[in-house]
Every structure is written in structure tokens, then in C-alpha cells.
Swiss-Prot record:
<dbReference type="GO" id="GO:0015949">
    <property type="term" value="P:nucleobase-containing small molecule interconversion"/>
</dbReference>
<comment type="function">
    <text>Catalyzes the deamination of dCTP to dUTP.</text>
</comment>
<keyword id="KW-0378">Hydrolase</keyword>
<dbReference type="Pfam" id="PF22769">
    <property type="entry name" value="DCD"/>
</dbReference>
<dbReference type="GO" id="GO:0006226">
    <property type="term" value="P:dUMP biosynthetic process"/>
</dbReference>
<feature type="binding site">
    <location>
        <position position="181"/>
    </location>
    <ligand>
        <name>dCTP</name>
    </ligand>
</feature>
<keyword id="KW-0547">Nucleotide-binding</keyword>
<dbReference type="InterPro" id="IPR033704">
    <property type="entry name" value="dUTPase_trimeric"/>
</dbReference>
<comment type="pathway">
    <text>Pyrimidine metabolism; dUMP biosynthesis; dUMP from dCTP (dUTP route): step 1/2.</text>
</comment>
<dbReference type="InterPro" id="IPR036157">
    <property type="entry name" value="dUTPase-like_sf"/>
</dbReference>
<feature type="binding site">
    <location>
        <begin position="136"/>
        <end position="138"/>
    </location>
    <ligand>
        <name>dCTP</name>
    </ligand>
</feature>
<feature type="binding site">
    <location>
        <position position="171"/>
    </location>
    <ligand>
        <name>dCTP</name>
    </ligand>
</feature>
<dbReference type="GO" id="GO:0008829">
    <property type="term" value="F:dCTP deaminase activity"/>
</dbReference>
<feature type="binding site">
    <location>
        <begin position="112"/>
        <end position="117"/>
    </location>
    <ligand>
        <name>dCTP</name>
    </ligand>
</feature>
<dbReference type="InterPro" id="IPR011962">
    <property type="entry name" value="dCTP_deaminase"/>
</dbReference>
<dbReference type="GO" id="GO:0000166">
    <property type="term" value="F:nucleotide binding"/>
</dbReference>
<comment type="similarity">
    <text>Belongs to the dCTP deaminase family.</text>
</comment>
């Protein structure tokens, strides 16, 4: 497996629709000129943005978090340019970008240091071969203070690995439960 460069990412996005919408360069300023958390193509990855759709965790309605029997009432829907995550809590969001992963590619997603250095951890599972959809993002606030997430700015970096061999069974072939997801998607069994 080899890690893919900015040149490959641009080609796959522009010729094959791998990332939509796609930013071929690194964006560090908003249209009005103020600094933002960067997003777009980097040397060996793509910095993804968070949309303005959040699901903020609340423990008002639930006593237990059970991934096999998840209660959707455990979240409050928030549509905003910022999301304030309470201390020691978390939120879900989705990317601005829609991904279509080639059959011979696997991605790993890592949080941006801007957020990590503030105690905000971004967790995203790998994008498997032939998976497509908006990415559900998990934000954990590890601090004893409220933490702010900015919509339409960079939150994590996707690194693309191309295999030297095509997999026998892709995520699409398996009928993966998160295939083609739109919006913020809660756990499924």
C-alpha cells in the first residue's frame, strides 16, 4: 500500500468525483479575509470540513449508552455555525464533503492538531473500499470546559492508501450499513 499525494487526490476528485465539493488547494482564510481552521488538499491528504448539522449528546433522557440499542433521544439536533460541546461530552456531525472511495483504496482519518491541542478529539473510522457518503464525525471534549467546533472549517485530515491488489469483497459488495449515508448517522446494528 502506498500513501497518495496531492496530485493523485486532485486527479481522482476532478476526474472521478471522489470528493464533492472539492477544494484543490489549502484554504486558510474565509471570503471576508479572517483566518479559519484550514481545509482542502494538503501534501498527502485532504482536510475535511464539518457541516452546520450537529447532534449534541445529552444525558437527560438516558441512563446508559448502549451501541446495540442506541436511543436517538440521547441527542439534541443543532443547526448552527458553531457547536458548543459541554465538558467531558461529545457531539456528532457530518462532513461538507461527499466521498466515493475507489475499490483499491482505504482511508485513515486523523484529527487536526488545532483541535487536538485544545483537548477536542475527532474520531472517524476508515473509509473502506467502495464506501460512499457523507462522513459522520465524532467530537469528544476531553476538557472540564465547554469546547467550540466551527462549521464549514477544517476538522480532520483524510489520508488515502492505494493497495497493490484489489480486494475480493468491498464495503459496497457486503452491503455495508453506512453505505450512501446522508446527514448525521447514528449507530446501526
Amino acid at each position: 500500500m502506498t500513501i497518495k499525494s496531492d496530485k493523485w487526490i486532485r486527479r481522482m476528485a476532478m476526474e472521478h468525483g471522489m470528493i464533492e465539493p472539492f477544494e484543490p488547494n489549502q484554504v486558510k482564510h474565509a471570503p471576508d479575509g479572517h483566518k479559519i481552521v484550514s481545509y482542502g488538499t494538503s501534501s498527502y491528504g485532504y482536510d475535511i470540513r464539518c457541516s452546520d448539522e450537529f447532534k449534541l449528546f445529552t444525558n437527560i433522557n438516558s441512563a446508559i449508552v448502549d451501541p446495540k440499542n442506541f436511543d436517538s433521544n440521547s441527542f439534541v439536533d443543532v443547526k448552527s455555525n458553531i457547536c458548543l460541546i459541554p465538558p467531558n461530552s461529545f457531539a456528532l456531525a457530518r462532513t461538507v464533503e461527499y466521498f466515493r472511495i475507489p475499490r483499491n483504496v482505504l482511508t485513515i482519518c486523523l484529527g487536526k492538531s488545532t483541535y487536538a491541542r485544545c483537548g477536542i478529539i475527532v474520531n472517524v473510522t476508515p473509509f473502506e473500499p467502495e464506501w460512499e457518503g457523507f462522513v459522520t464525525l465524532e467530537f469528544s471534549n476531553t476538557t472540564p470546559l465547554p469546547a467550540k467546533i466551527y462549521a464549514n472549517e477544517g476538522v480532520a485530515q483524510v489520508i488515502f492508501f492505494e493497495s497493490d491488489e484489489i480486494c475480493e469483497t468491498s464495503y459496497k459488495d457486503r452491503g455495508g450499513k453506512y453505505q450512501g449515508q446522508h446527514g448525521v448517522t447514528l449507530p446501526k446494528i
